[in-house]
């Protein structure tokens, strides 16, 4: 892509992680295009179409002076010399037809003189041989996978008119691989519905069988369907093997070159026919590297192998092996040899290379005795070549040597050519032989073979006339030839030339071949004639060289395909045609010399990068400030001009992103907005410091672009990082009627996705009406592990209204010698509305080592060791205004060293009598047992004081 537009037409983009993104060069047409392929087997434009008209007449006068009659034989041959007359299919006709017409007509008339006792005879045989080669394609999924840079019109496919370059396929692995040494892939080319049919045919009424009359308008047709495996590659081969009695071609021998074409004239495989083994070996071109799912059908003109199938009315096994698939069929052959004719001739074959006519004439098959025998050949449009010494005269010693196929085994004949004087005249267009050779009479039989070469100076289509002038009559036979399609331009052994040269990498892009620049391997090169018809194709070798051989003088076109990853260099730079680049398509002229100046240069297509930065715009000004940092993990997508995604990445830890290996062209960069962030203002300052928005259109033209940025900021609605993993282990049994109406109207629109692991065992009945509309989506993992061991000094105004109706009927039979008249029958209806404000100013010298291990589960396990040696004058005004200031320091090892103001000895280890005291209730719950415990404790303390006081009093007494 050489888009010259600037980079200014882009809108919005985000930097991404600095990942290198490799992008494959986009070949035109990712979607596969179905293309029909037709293979045309064998003919390759070098088959002759022969129509042989033989006309023999015998007119003998009643006396010796009567002018001899003239026998005429007309033999027409439609000869396409070195041109292929393939008719390519049109868009509305998916069948491709190649006409290869060979029509042979033989008419021979032998009329004896009325002086003879026998009645006149008229023997007439007319034969028309028309051969047609047709190929048709089954339009299955044939997918173009070429790396060609331009589409081609396809006229043979009704619904598909262009061949698009491939995307994906085989060439993507090695786009410039030179052809490797191929292997035989007979097992990968599959043939079905094979048939050898007689076109027209003649029904033998006596036998009821259809016969192949080789000289009477019949032709053999080899037909088959085929498929080619996709694994087949350029250079691979497969074979057609013909049997002993069967060969390709018609009257004209098959060309050594047997190319296979598709409907558009593109060469699928190059075939070489070996007449020795009667085998054609096909080598696949790079076409099979460009297309997949190739399948089709074909018809191929074939003929009886006359040197082996020699006898009329005989069934011969016609056998063929196409790849690994074999087929055979017995066919009755008839050549129509007339053994009673003194003179009969036939075109044995037409040479496919020089179009020479190889003729065979049978002289005196009836073995008549003559005193005069002059054999004359007159050529029109042809010439003899006396130096070739190919005018042969063989004496027949065995009647069986006159084989019906007109192809005798000359090794078994007696060559007597040197015994005769062959006189050439009329510019080598007439040859005369006196077969009597000095004898007075003779009944000898001869087989005469000649070769007539086309004469380009003649405007006539040409003919060959034979006469046998005897003492009895004059016999004549004429063979004329015409072209069905009116073309006949070959000229014997015309010299052939070469065309080609070099494809190289132009590293400095100057359009000229420099000494340090190397060739490019594996570039496809196609040769076409002046009419645009493909003649050949090849692939450059490891040195970038290519060559087409065997070309005649003329004008040719050479097309180079652009290898993947390359761009054509400047064409026709400088004045030296031998070292410049001729472009993708060039014309080469051959005129009596090789043309090795057709070169093409390419340079590696440069690749570019784009990207930059995504940042956190903390001040929301749309500009990148030095203190603002990048945002990690933002997804960035790259699309091509068609909107196809060609890459995705994410910004790195610095907010950077990057796409690499891009061609010049138009792209779109799309930033995915991070959750919880808002797009900042766009295009607020210079291009490399602003934000470009969520989608940015950008054009790369021969340079990188690292100005594609985007910024985001976070809304300030309640930065409530409410992930308080508050492990508040507050074992605070605080019965705090704490109506903590914490109307914390934290309207933090902060989308609080608070992962609050609040393991707060805090029994705090906090009625916290936290109407926090906190939308704070702050994924703030504030693992505040606040191990709030809450020494909750809960000043719990525990109004312990203990209304302890301690009807203690304490019958304390205390052996207290207390003269206290205290009958202590203390029906102590202690309706002790003890507000337990226990400001117990108890001056009781009660050393109350109250190891009150108040584990704040307020189990009141008051191990009150009241050893109170208290001299307690104890006016124990136990006005226990126990306001229960309840320093509920829940694990409070409250050693409650209740200083009773009495310097007493620490003795009275009063044991806790509530060994099974129950735990304090949950905060806010009601439990009278706790109040009762306090009441009883107070009563016991008072009772103890009374007893102690009584004992002291007694001692004092």
UniProtKB/Swiss-Prot annotation:
Residues 51-166, 678-937 are annotated as: Disordered. The modification Pentaglycyl murein peptidoglycan amidated threonine is found at residue 923. It is a peptidoglycan-anchor. Residues 685-695, 712-896 have a biased composition (Acidic residues). Keywords: Calcium, Cell wall, Peptidoglycan-anchor, Repeat, Secreted, Signal. Pfam families: Big_8 (PF17961), Gram_pos_anchor (PF00746), SdrD_B (PF17210), SdrG_C_C (PF10425), YSIRK_signal (PF04650). GO terms for cellular component: extracellular region. Residues 1-50 form the signal peptide. A motif (LPXTG sorting signal) lies at residues 920-924. It is found in: Secreted, Cell wall. Residues 115-132, 922-937 have a biased composition (Low complexity). Residues 72-83 have a biased composition (Basic and acidic residues). GO terms for biological process: cell adhesion. Residues 56-71, 84-114, 133-164 have a biased composition (Polar residues). InterPro entries: Adhesin_Fg-bd_dom_2, Adhesion_dom_sf, Fibrogen-bd_dom1, Ig-like_fold, LPXTG_anchor, SDr-like, Sdr_B, SDR_Ig. Residues 51-495 are annotated as: Ligand binding A region. Homodimerizes; via N2-Domain. Interacts with host NRXN1; this interaction mediates bacterial attachment to host cells. Cell surface-associated calcium-binding protein which plays an important role in adhesion and pathogenesis. Mediates interactions with components of the extracellular matrix such as host NRXN1 to promote bacterial adhesion. This is Serine-aspartate repeat-containing protein C. It comes from Staphylococcus aureus (strain MSSA476). The gene is sdrC.
């Amino acid at each position: 892509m050489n888009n010259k537009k600037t980079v200014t037409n882009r809108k919005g983009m985000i930097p991404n992680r600095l990942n290198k993104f490799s992008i494959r060069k986009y070949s035109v047409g990712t979607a596969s295009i179905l293309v029909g392929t037709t293979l045309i087997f064998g003919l390759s434009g070098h088959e002759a179409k022969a129509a042989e008209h033989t006309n023999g007449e015998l007119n003998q006068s009643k006396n010796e002076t009567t002018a001899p009659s003239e026998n005429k034989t007309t033999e027409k041959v439609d000869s396409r010399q070195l041109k292929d007359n393939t008719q390519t299919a049109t868009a509305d006709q998916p069948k491709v037809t190649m006409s290869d017409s060979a029509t042979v007509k033989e008419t021979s008339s032998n009329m004896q003189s009325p002086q003879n006792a026998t009645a006149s005879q008229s023997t007439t045989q007319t034969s028309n041989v028309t051969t047609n080669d047709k190929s048709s394609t089954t339009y299955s999924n044939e997918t173009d996978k070429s790396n060609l840079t331009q589409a081609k019109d396809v006229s043979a496919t009704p619904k598909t008119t262009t061949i698009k370059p491939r995307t994906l396929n085989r060439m993507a692995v090695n786009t410039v691989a030179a052809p490797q040494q191929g292997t035989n892939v007979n097992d990968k080319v599959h043939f079905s519905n094979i048939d050898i049919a007689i076109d027209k045919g003649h029904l033998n009424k006596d036998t009821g069988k259809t016969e192949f009359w080789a000289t009477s308008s019949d032709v053999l047709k080899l037909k088959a369907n085929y498929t080619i495996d996709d694994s087949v590659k350029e250079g691979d081969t497969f074979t057609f093997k013909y049997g002993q009695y069967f060969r390709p071609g018609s009257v004209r021998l098959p060309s050594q070159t047997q190319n296979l074409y598709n409907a558009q004239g593109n060469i699928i495989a190059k075939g070489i026919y070996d007449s020795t083994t009667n085998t054609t070996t096909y080598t696949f071109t790079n076409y099979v590297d460009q297309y997949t799912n190739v399948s089709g059908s074909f018809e191929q003109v074939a003929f009886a192998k006359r040197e082996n199938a020699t006898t009329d009315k005989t069934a011969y096994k016609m056998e063929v092996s196409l790849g690994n698939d074999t087929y055979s069929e017995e066919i009755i052959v008839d050549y129509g040899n007339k053994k009673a004719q003194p003179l009969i001739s036939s075109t044995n074959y037409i040479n496919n290379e020089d179009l020479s006519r190889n003729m065979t004439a049978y002289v005196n098959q009836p073995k008549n005795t003559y005193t005069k025998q002059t054999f004359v050949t007159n050529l029109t449009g042809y010439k003899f070549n006396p130096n070739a010494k190919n005018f042969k005269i063989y004496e027949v010693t065995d009647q069986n040597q006159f084989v019906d196929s007109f192809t005798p085994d000359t090794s078994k004949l007696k060559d007597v050519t040197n015994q005769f004087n062959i006189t050439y005249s009329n510019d080598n267009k007439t040859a005369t032989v006196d077969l009597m050779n000095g004898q007075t009479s003779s009944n000898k039989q001869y087989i005469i073979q000649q070769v007539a070469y086309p004469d380009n100076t003649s405007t006539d289509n040409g003919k060959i006339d034979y006469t046998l002038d005897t003492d009895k009559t004059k016999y004549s036979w004429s063979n004329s030839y015409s072209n069905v399609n009116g073309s006949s331009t070959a000229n014997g052994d015309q010299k052939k030339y070469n065309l080609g040269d070099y494809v190289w990498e132009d590293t400095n892009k100057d359009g000229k071949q420099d000494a340090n620049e190397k060739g490019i391997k594996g570039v496809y090169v196609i040769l076409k004639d002046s009419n645009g018809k493909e003649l050949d194709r090849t692939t450059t070798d490891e040195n970038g060289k290519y060559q087409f051989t065997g070309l005649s003088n003329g004008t040719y076109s050479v097309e180079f395909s652009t290898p993947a990853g390359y761009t054509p260099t400047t064409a026709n730079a400088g004045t030296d045609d031998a070292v410049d680049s001729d472009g993708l398509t060039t014309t080469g002229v051959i005129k009596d010399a090789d043309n090795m100046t057709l070169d093409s240069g390419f340079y590696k297509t440069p690749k570019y990068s784009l990207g930059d930065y995504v940042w956190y715009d903390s001040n929301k000004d749309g500009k990148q400030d030095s203190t603002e940092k990048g945002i990690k993990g933002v997804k960035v997508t790259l699309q091509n001009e068609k909107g196809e995604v060609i890459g995705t990445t994410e910004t790195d830890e610095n907010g950077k992103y990057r796409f690499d290996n891009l061609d010049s062209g138009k792209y779109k960069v799309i930033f995915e907005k991070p959750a919880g962030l808002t797009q900042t203002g766009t295009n607020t300052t210079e291009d490399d410091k602003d934000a470009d928005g969520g989608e940015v259109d950008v054009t790369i033209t021969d340079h990188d672009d690292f100005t594609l940025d985007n910024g985001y900021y976070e809304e300030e609605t309640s930065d409530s990082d409410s992930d308080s993993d508050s492990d508040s282990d507050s074992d605070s049994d605080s019965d705090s009627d704490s109506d903590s109406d914490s109307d914390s109207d934290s309207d933090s629109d902060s989308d609080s996705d608070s992962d609050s692991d609040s393991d707060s065992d805090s029994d705090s009945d906090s009625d916290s009406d936290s109407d926090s509309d906190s939308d704070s989506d702050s994924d703030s993992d504030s693992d505040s592990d606040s191990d709030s061991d809450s020494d909750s000094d809960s000043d719990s105004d525990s109004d312990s209204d203990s209304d302890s109706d301690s009807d203690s009927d304490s019958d304390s039979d205390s052996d207290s010698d207390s003269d206290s008249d205290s009958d202590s029958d203390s029906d102590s209806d202690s309706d002790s509305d003890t507000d337990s404000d226990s400001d117990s100013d108890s001056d009781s010298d009660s050393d109350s080592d109250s190891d009150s291990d108040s584990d704040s589960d307020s189990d009141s396990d008051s191990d009150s060791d009241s050893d109170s040696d208290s001299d307690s004058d104890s006016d124990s005004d136990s006005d226990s205004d126990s306001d229960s200031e309840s320093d509920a320091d829940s694990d409070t090892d409250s050693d409650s060293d209740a200083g009773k103001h009495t310097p007493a000895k620490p003795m009275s280890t009063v044991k806790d009598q509530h060994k099974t005291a129950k735990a304090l209730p949950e905060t806010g719950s009601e439990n009278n047992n706790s109040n009762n415990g306090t009441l009883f404790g107070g009563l016991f303390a008072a009772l103890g004081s009374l007893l102690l006081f009584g004992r002291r009093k007694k001692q004092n007494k």
